[in-house]
Amino acid sequence: MTVYGSHEGVGEGVLASGTGSAGLSGMEPVTLEISGKHWTFNSLKDLMGKASPMRSGDVTAGCAASCDEELVAAQMLLADVPLAQFLEEPLIPYEKDEVTRLIVDTHDVAAFTPVKNLSVGAFRDWLLRYETDEQTLAALAPGLTPEMVAAVSKICANQDLILIASKCRVVTAFRDTIGLRGRLSTRLQPNHATDDLKGIAASMLEGLLYGCGDAVIGINPATDSVPMMQELLKLIDELIHRYHIPTQSCVLAHVTNALEVMRAGTPVDLVFQSIAGTEIANGVFGVNLGILQETYDAALSLKRGTVGQNVMYFETGQGSALSGRGDWGVDMQTCEARAYAVARKFKPLLVNTVVGFIGPEYLYDGKQIIRAGLEDHFCGKLL
């Protein structure tokens, strides 16, 4: 039995497990006593879900804490879990999920070395240290898995998430550079209800006059067809080159359509795709790692970037795996962090987390949406 000291204002914390090792061991249940009440967690997956700050989607999925006391108990226990345990105990089976295989197979053991002996709680303290700077975090990133980063985010206050994320720089480039300190880039989104080219052109010019569009000029087409995608891409490309605008274009259609228009010689800058953190959820989007790799390679081969070759544009969002019945019982925020492992493989220019987009059944109100946005920003920056 492993016994933890008292936690001020909470009471005595006692962790009971089948072994004398610190943290959780395999799938053995663990129990924490707080003020005379015992809270039991059956697995690392269960502990991660119960340690997540409340959100409606986790309640619907049945993996959320039942009350604030259980949430605190789970967070206290999670803080003592060794980071290395996430390498030993995948939340989603390696044999049944290609995203898990990607995470495990690409883990950089050497990069992980500086924090390999830390617990989740000690890792939080390490991240908050003044000495942990931008260069240190950049070197560490390949050694972190999404589950490690998701775990530490669950025991961070909002201020912690903001402070730690502010230490990280994620700089990408295509025709311009995004992510430098002190800069803010915006997407120009000249959508039209009927994909009318004149209406879209007018909207683009108006947006440019407002100084928008340096991140991307990206259109959500009303109809997801190859001919319309070609027309829209040609329109944006003509505008960019006529006025020598240092930005990039994207039509937010499926990657298979993008692959088809590239083969036809249509000018494609960025390739868009919605992605998720599990193989099943990505299958709902009609993609897998193989399709993404094929499209990524095709876009790279065009060599259309002038200052960089980050050619992918991904969209993610907490709840996508749950809505696609591909969550494996894992909480929404951890599934979302796993989507960033998919994104990381393809070195994207942009990753857009559409926080709260699915609806209140996943993130109920402004408080939950703000928390989710801070978590996503934190996890994406660290990874």
Question: Can you name each region flagged by the protein language model?
Answer:
Residues 20, 24-201, 209, 216-383:
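Anaerobic metallocofactor- and corrinoid-dependent redox/one-carbon enzyme cores
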Residues 4-5, 15-18:
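Mature N-terminal, pre-catalytic/accessory segment of carbohydrate-active enzymes
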